[in-house]
């Protein structure tokens, strides 16, 4: 069975001031798909974390290298897949998870290890997260539409009649 997918691709300079463009695009795509407000906010946080990690860490220490962050939105009928990739420095994801250990409700903010919270947020807010660290880092995240799906056209029609 072939699934229909719409692909939206963007590349931004690896600079913090461009992460907002990705957030705005994501918000529009997710809204059009029918995600509810809370889900859109979760998506924006997770994607912002992935982009910010790329901006802050990927090209650190690479003299004069202006890197870029590539973001792909794969729009399916039942889910949104988002891939954030850079070609900068990579890291050992499994080792990083082991070093940081699990976060629990018993931890206070002061007890949290510096770094790694972004990965935790991505894993908490998204349905699926996969990190590949080869030549650069690629973070693939998936969020499924749930039963509270908003019918965008019906919502607009209701608004226009009220």
Curated annotation (Swiss-Prot):
Its EC number is 2.7.11.1. It catalyses: L-seryl-[protein] + ATP = O-phospho-L-seryl-[protein] + ADP + H(+); L-threonyl-[protein] + ATP = O-phospho-L-threonyl-[protein] + ADP + H(+). It comes from the Bacteria. Keywords: ATP-binding, Kinase, Nucleotide-binding, Serine/threonine-protein kinase, Transferase. CDD domains: HATPase_RsbW-like (cd16936). Pfam families: HATPase_c_2. GO terms for molecular function: ATP binding; protein serine kinase activity; protein serine/threonine kinase activity; sigma factor antagonist activity. Negative regulator of sigma-B activity. Phosphorylates and inactivates its specific antagonist protein, RsbV. Upon phosphorylation of RsbV, RsbW is released and binds to sigma-B, thereby blocking its ability to form an RNA polymerase holoenzyme (E-sigma-B). Belongs to the anti-sigma-factor family. This is Serine-protein kinase RsbW. It comes from Bacillus pumilus (strain SAFR-032). The gene is rsbW.
């Amino acid at each position: 069975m072939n699934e229909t997918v719409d692909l939206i691709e963007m590349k931004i300079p690896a600079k913090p001031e461009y992460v907002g463009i990705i957030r705005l695009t994501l918000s529009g795509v997710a809204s059009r798909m029918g995600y509810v407000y809370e889900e859109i906010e979760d998506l924006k946080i997770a994607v912002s974390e992935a982009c910010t990690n790329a901006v802050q860490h990927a090209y650190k220490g690479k003299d004069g290298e202006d890197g870029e962050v590539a973001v792909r939105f794969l729009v399916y009928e039942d889910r949104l897949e988002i891939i954030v990739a850079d070609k900068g420095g990579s890291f050992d994801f499994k080792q990083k998870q082991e070093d940081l250990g699990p976060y629990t409700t018993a931890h206070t903010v002061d007890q949290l290890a510096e770094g790694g919270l972004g990965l935790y947020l991505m894993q908490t807010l998204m349905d699926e997260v996969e990190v590949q660290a080869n030549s650069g880092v690629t973070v693939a995240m998936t969020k499924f539409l749930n039963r509270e799906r908003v019918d965008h056209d019906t919502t607009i029609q209701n608004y226009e009649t009220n």
